[in-house]
């Protein structure tokens, strides 16, 4: 049973994405928290990003993706003082924006970067609705991050976003449709060949909205 317990403990699950004004992700964080991977409540976000930016390749990747969302960002910065670490975005010219002033969406995006750009993630990572709080035009970037991270870990992602699904039109087989039935929830993986003619004319999200792949409310 120890092996099974260790396996379950190695699964990273992100279900509650709350980044309001009093959340731990905004506040200075104790330096004795784990720094290897993001905790479910993102309470060690500053510590994880502090570790990741020490690696040149990962730092470049983080900044490149951050600039797609936050054009003014030059660097991800952290300050360690009095046993705590605080997160900032460096906009250049000594203009450091603390996590306490960042939008909910920016903190959510930084958390996704901390998860999806990590070079050595846990073996299984589960993320519920990564699109929440983000502008639809950034969802293709989220899809790109998901594809990249899936090369290093098994990702399980839930979504209600047709924009995010559309951004995965090139890999329809990655989508599993969940539907209720009298016998319980049914899971069905999409098949590229059966959708080929549809995908010649429409994105996967459009096909979903048309009701052609299931996963609808009716």
What are these regions (language model features)?
Residues 1-109, 113-120, 213-215:
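Phosphate-coordinating catalytic segments in nucleotide- and nucleic-acid-processing enzymes
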Residues 105-108, 135, 190:
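Gly/Ser/Thr-rich active-site loops/lids in small-molecule metabolic enzymes
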Residues 128-129:
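Walker B catalytic acidic pair
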Residues 132-136, 140:
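Conserved D-loop-proximal element of ABC-family nucleotide-binding domains
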Residues 141-218:
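C-terminal lobe/lid and adjacent interdomain/linker elements of RecA-like ASCE P-loop ATPase modules
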């Amino acid at each position: 049973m120890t092996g099974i317990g260790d396996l379950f403990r190695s699964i990273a699950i992100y279900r509650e994405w709350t980044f309001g004004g009093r959340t731990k992700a905004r506040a200075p964080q104790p330096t004795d928290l784990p720094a290897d991977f993001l905790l479910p409540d993102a309470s060690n976000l500053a510590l994880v990003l502090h570790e990741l930016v020490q690696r040149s390749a990962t730092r470049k990747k983080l900044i490149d993706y951050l600039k797609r969302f936050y054009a003014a960002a030059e660097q991800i910065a952290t300050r360690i003082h009095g046993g705590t670490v605080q997160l900032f975005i460096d906009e250049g010219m000594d203009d450091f924006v603390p996590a306490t002033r960042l939008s909910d969406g920016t903190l959510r995006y930084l958390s996704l970067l901390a998860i999806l750009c990590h070079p050595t993630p846990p073996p299984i990572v589960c993320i519920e609705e990564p699109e929440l709080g983000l502008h639809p035009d950034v969802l293709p970037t989220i899809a790109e991050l998901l594809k990249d991270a899936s090369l290093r870990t098994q990702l399980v992602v839930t979504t209600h976003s047709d924009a995010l699904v559309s951004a995965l039109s090139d890999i329809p087989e990655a989508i599993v449709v969940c539907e209720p039935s009298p016998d319980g929830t049914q899971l069905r993986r999409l098949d590229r060949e059966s959708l080929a003619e549809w995908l010649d004319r429409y994105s996967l999200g459009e096909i979903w909205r048309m009701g052609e792949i299931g996963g609808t409310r009716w």
